UniProtKB/Swiss-Prot annotation:
Belongs to the polyribonucleotide nucleotidyltransferase family. Residues 662-734 form the S1 motif domain. InterPro entries: ExoRNase_PH_dom1, ExoRNase_PH_dom2, ExoRNase_PH_dom2_sf, GPSI/PNP, KH_dom, KH_dom_type_1, KH_dom_type_1_sf, NA-bd_OB-fold. Its cofactor is Mg(2+). PANTHER family: POLYRIBONUCLEOTIDE NUCLEOTIDYLTRANSFERASE, POLYRIBONUCLEOTIDE NUCLEOTIDYLTRANSFERASE 1, MITOCHONDRIAL. GO terms for biological process: mRNA catabolic process; RNA processing. This is Polyribonucleotide nucleotidyltransferase. Residues 737-757 are annotated as: Disordered. Keywords: Cytoplasm, Magnesium, Metal-binding, Nucleotidyltransferase, RNA-binding, Transferase. Mg(2+) binds at residues 525, 531.
Length: 757
C-alpha cells in the first residue's frame, strides 16, 4: 500500500560559531482528519504535532472569537513514565500553560475579524531532546497548521528564542547554553510589506528575561542587557523570523486547503455606529475626562443606559433595524475608543488628565502584616498589591516533573486576582491561566537579583495579592515583591521595579502616528493597541512581556517605549528605596538555616543505619537537616540556638576537628590584609583576626598597618568568637594577662564552675 505524499519545507538558521539549527515542517502524514496538521522538527530529536480544527457551525451568540490553544506534554517524549498514582498525564504543567499563552498572543489577532466558529489548535510534544526548549518551535507549528487549515488567517507567524551569549545572539539556544547567557528573549512576528515593496518584520509578541546567572556574568564583564541591548535583540530576531515565515509559506503553497468562506459576524453595522456616535460622542468626551475610576465608570454606565434607551426607541420607530440592539454594546465601545484615542493623539492628554509619560501617585510600605516573614503594600493609583514572603528550608523548594531538565525551583511567585479587586463578584479558588502567567512574569523579574543558594540557603515563596486593580497588577507585583523580600531579610543584589506601557496608533495625514503611554490604566489597556510590561533594576532589564492587538509594531516604536519605561522605572525605584533601602533583620518567626560542609564519604555515617543518627539529632535539637550530594548539610530551626546545637552534633560526627565558638588555639598567621590577618588554626581551617582586634595587641592604640603588629608565620594565641552561617570564623587575641587571670580563677575555684569573664 502506497503511503500519503509528504510535503515539507525547512529553514536552516545560522548561529556562526555555535553551529546551525534546522527547523523542518512536514504535512500529509499525521492527523489527516484535522483541517490543518503539521509535524515540526527542531534538528533531528525534537518533534511536535500541531493540529488545527474548526467547528462546523458558528457560535452566533458569542461576541468574541472562540479560539482555544492546548499544549499536550507527553511523558514518552522524554522517555519518562508519569510520576502520578495512575501513571498517566494529568492536568497541564505550568510550562504547558505558559506555552499556550505564548502561542495564543500572536495567533489570536491573525484570524479574520468576526469569525465565530470554534477554532482549536492542539500542540502535542511527541519527542524532545533533553537539553531543548520547545516553546518557540510550538509557535511556528501552530501557525503552520493554521495556514493549511483553510481558515482565513493572515499568517505566517514565526517565533524564535534567542540568547545573548557573549556578544552574539544565538537562535534556539539549549538549556545548557543559557548558563553562559545574560539575556533570553522570545519574539514572534510576521513579515509585512510597505507601499514601496520593502519587507520588514512587525513584532507581535515578546517574552524576555535576564537569566538566573546574569548578575554574576555581568560582574565578570559580560554585556549588561540594558534597553539598547534589548532593542538589538529585537532586530537580531528579524532575519530568523523571515526565514521561518518563508518556510511556512513554502509549505502552505504545497499543502494548504482552499480558504473557506466562513460566516463573519461584524460587531456592528455602520448605521448603528453612526446612531450611537450622534447620541453619545459629546458626552463621552466629558465622561472620559474624569480622573477617578469609580466616578468615571458610574458616569459611563449612566450614559450607556440612556443611549441604549434612545437606540431602542429608534428601533421601535423603525429608524434602525432590530439588529441595532444586539450591536449596541460593540458600537458604544468603538465610539468610546474613538473619543479616548483621539484625545491622546490630538492633545497628548489621557482620560485621567495625565500626560503621555506621567505616572500615577505612588505609595510603598513594608511590614504591614504581623508574624509573617516579610510583607509590603505597593500602590500605584488605584492598583494596590499586597506582597507576602515566606522562607523555609531548601527541602521545601518545588519539585518539578515535566519535560524540562529543570527538576527543582527554590523561588516561587504565586499571584492571586480576587474578583473584589475590581469591585465585582466571581469565582475564587484554583488559579486561571492569566494568574499563572502574571505570577510567572513577576517571578522572572526577580530571579536575576536573588542571592545564590550558598549565600542564602532558603526556599522562598512570594505571594502577590491584587487588592485593587486599575492597570498592570503584574508590574505592581514586581514592586511589592521587592519590598516584601527585603523586609524578610532576603539580600537582593539590587531592587527591581516594573511599569506597564501602552500604545495608541492611528493614521493621520496618510502617516501612521504612534503615542506611547506610561503606566496605563485598565481602560487604556482595553482601548489601546499594546500592553508592554518592562521590569528591571536601575542598570538593566530583568523581564519584558509584550502583547499587541495590531498586525505588528515597528521595532523603532518599541525602542522608544523601552526608553520611556526606563525613566518611569527609575522614578519608582526611588519610591521603593525610600520605603526600604536594604534587607531588614529576619523576622523572629522565620526559620534559621545554616550550612555545614562535610566530606562526601561521611554522609553515610551522618545519616546512620536507616536514618537513625540524623533522626536522633533532629529529635534532640528540634532542627531539620537535609544533605546534598556534594556534602553540603543544610540545618534549619526555629531559632539560632537549636541550629547551633545541631551543627555541633553534625561536626562532632562528620567534622570532628571542626572548631567551636569559645575554643582557643595557638595559630599561625598565614596572610596579611588591609582589614586584618588570617590565622591558620587547623589544617584547612583559617579564621580572620580583624584589624579592630589587632589593636588589642598594640595596647589599644590605633593600627594603620596590620604588618606593624603581625607578620606572616608568627604564632599567636586566639579564641573563636563567632562562626557565621557559611562556616567562616571570627577571632580575637587571647592576651597574656587574660590567660593568667583565667588560670588563677580556675585554681581558686577548684572544681567549681569557672568565673564569668
Amino acid at each position: 500500500m502506497e503511503g500519503p505524499e509528504i510535503k515539507f519545507a525547512e529553514a536552516v538558521l545560522d548561529n556562526g560559531k555555535y553551529g546551525t539549527r534546522t527547523v523542518r515542517f512536514e504535512a500529509g502524514r499525521l492527523a489527516q482528519q484535522a483541517q490543518g496538521a503539521v509535524a515540526a522538527y527542531l534538528d533531528e530529536d525534537t518533534m511536535l504535532l500541531s493540529a488545527t480544527s474548526v467547528g462546523k457551525h458558528p457560535k452566533d451568540n458569542f461576541d468574541f472569537f472562540p479560539l482555544t490553544i492546548d499544549v499536550e506534554e507527553r511523558s514518552y517524549a522524554a522517555g519518562k513514565i508519569p510520576g502520578s498514582f495512575f501513571r498517566r498525564e494529568g492536568r497541564p504543567s505550568t510550562e504547558a500553560i505558559l506555552v499556550c499563552r505564548l502561542i495564543d498572543r500572536p495567533l489570536r489577532p491573525s484570524f479574520i475579524t468576526g469569525l465565530r466558529n470554534e477554532v482549536q489548535v492542539v500542540i502535542t510534544v511527541l519527542s524532545i531532546a533533553p537539553d531543548e526548549f520547545y516553546d518557540s518551535l510550538a509557535i511556528n507549528a501552530a501557525s503552520a497548521s493554521s495556514m493549511l487549515s483553510g481558515i482565513p488567517f493572515s499568517g505566517p507567524i514565526a517565533g524564535v528564542r534567542l540568547a545573548l551569549i557573549g556578544d552574539q545572539w544565538v537562535v534556539f539556544p539549549k538549556h545548557s547554553q543559557l548558563k553562559e547567557a545574560v539575556f533570553d528573549i522570545t519574539v514572534a512576528g510576521r513579515v509585512v510589506t510597505d507601499s514601496e515593496g520593502n519587507e520588514d518584520v512587525a513584532i507581535m509578541m515578546v517574552e524576555a528575561e535576564a537569566t538566573e546567572g546574569a548578575w554574576d556574568l555581568i560582574q565578570g564583564g559580560a554585556t549588561k542587557p540594558d534597553e539598547a541591548i534589548v532593542a538589538q535583540g529585537l532586530e537580531a530576531a528579524k532575519p530568523f523570523i523571515q526565514q521561518l515565515v518563508a518556510a511556512q509559506a513554502s509549505l502552505a503553497q504545497q499543502a494548504a486547503k482552499p480558504t473557506v468562506d466562513y460566516p463573519v459576524f461584524l460587531p456592528y453595522a455602520q448605521e448603528t455606529y453612526d446612531a450611537v456616535s450622534a447620541l453619545a460622542l459629546d458626552e463621552l468626551g466629558t465622561v472620559y475626562q474624569t480622573a477617578d475610576k469609580i466616578e468615571r465608570q458610574d458616569a459611563d454606565d449612566a450614559l450607556k443606559t440612556r443611549t441604549k434607551e434612545a437606540v431602542a426607541a429608534k428601533v421601535e420607530a423603525g429608524e434602525l433595524p432590530q439588529s441595532a440592539l444586539t450591536e449596541f454594546s460593540a458600537a458604544y465601545k468603538s465610539v468610546t475608543k474613538t473619543v479616548v484615542r483621539g484625545r491622546i493623539l490630538r492633545d497628548g492628554v489621557r482620560m485621567d488628565g495625565r500626560g503621555l509619560a506621567d505616572i500615577r501617585p505612588l505609595d510603598a510600605e513594608v511590614q504591614v502584616i504581623p508574624r509573617v516573614h516579610g510583607s509590603a503594600i505597593f500602590q500605584r493609583g488605584e492598583t494596590q498589591i499586597l506582597g507576602v514572603t515566606t522562607l523555609n528550608m531548601l527541602k521545601m523548594e518545588q519539585q518539578i516533573d515535566s519535560l524540562s531538565p529543570i527538576t527543582k525551583k527554590r523561588y516561587l511567585h504565586h499571584y492571586n486576582f480576587p474578583p473584589y479587586s475590581t469591585g465585582e463578584t466571581g469565582r475564587v479558588g484554583s488559579p486561571k491561566r492569566r494568574e499563572i502567567g502574571h505570577g510567572f512574569l513577576a517571578e522572572r523579574a526577580l530571579v536575576p537579583v536573588l542571592p545564590s543558594r550558598e549565600d542564602f540557603p532558603y526556599a522562598i515563596r512570594q505571594v502577590s495579592e491584587a487588592l485593587g486593580s486599575n492597570g498592570s497588577t503584574s508590574m505592581g507585583s514586581v514592586c511589592a515583591s521587592t519590598l516584601s523580600l527585603l523586609n524578610a531579610g532576603v539580600p537582593l543584589r539590587a531592587p527591581v521595579a516594573g511599569i506597564a506601557m501602552g500604545l495608541v496608533s492611528d493614521t493621520v495625514d496618510g502617516q501612521v502616528r504612534y503615542a506611547a503611554l506610561t503606566d496605563i490604566l485598565g481602560a487604556e489597556d482595553a482601548l489601546g493597541d499594546m500592553d508592554f510590561k518592562v521590569a528591571g533594576t536601575s542598570e538593566f532589564v530583568t523581564a519584558i512581556q509584550l502583547d499587541t492587538k495590531l498586525d505588528g509594531i515597528p521595532t523603532s516604536v518599541l525602542d522608544g517605549a523601552l526608553k520611556q519605561a526606563k525613566e518611569a522605572r527609575t522614578a519608582i525605584l526611588g519610591v521603593l528605596n525610600q520605603a526600604i533601602d536594604g534587607p531588614d533583620e529576619m523576622a523572629p518567626t522565620a526559620p534559621r538555616v545554616i550550612s555545614v560542609n562535610i566530606p562526601v564519604d561521611k554522609i553515610g555515617e551522618l545519616i546512620g543505619p536507616k536514618g537513625k543518627t540524623i533522626n536522633a539529632i533532629q529529635d534532640e535539637t528540634g532542627a531539620d537537616i537535609s544533605i546534598e550530594e556534594d556534602g553540603t548539610v543544610y540545618i534549619g530551626a526555629v531559632d539560632g540556638p537549636s541550629a547551633d546545637a545541631a551543627r555541633a552534633q553534625v561536626n562532632a560526627i562528620a567534622n570532628p576537628t571542626n572548631p567551636e565558638v569559645g575554643e582557643s588555639f595557638l595559630g599561625t598567621v598565614v596572610k596579611i590584609a588591609t582589614f586584618g590577618a588570617f590565622v591558620s588554626l587547623l589544617p584547612g581551617k583559617d579564621g580572620l583576626l580583624h584589624i579592630s582586634e589587632v589593636r588589642k595587641l598594640a595596647g589599644g592604640k590605633r593600627v594603620e598597618n596590620v604588618e606593624d603588629v603581625l607578620g606572616v608565620g608568627q604564632k599567636i594565641l586566639v579564641e573563636i568568637t563567632k562562626i557565621d552561617d557559611r562556616g567562616k570564623l571570627s577571632l580575637a587575641p587571647v592576651l597574656e594577662e587574660t590567660a593568667d587571670q583565667e588560670g588563677r580563677d580556675a585554681a581558686s575555684h577548684g572544681s567549681e564552675a569557672p568565673a564569668e569573664g
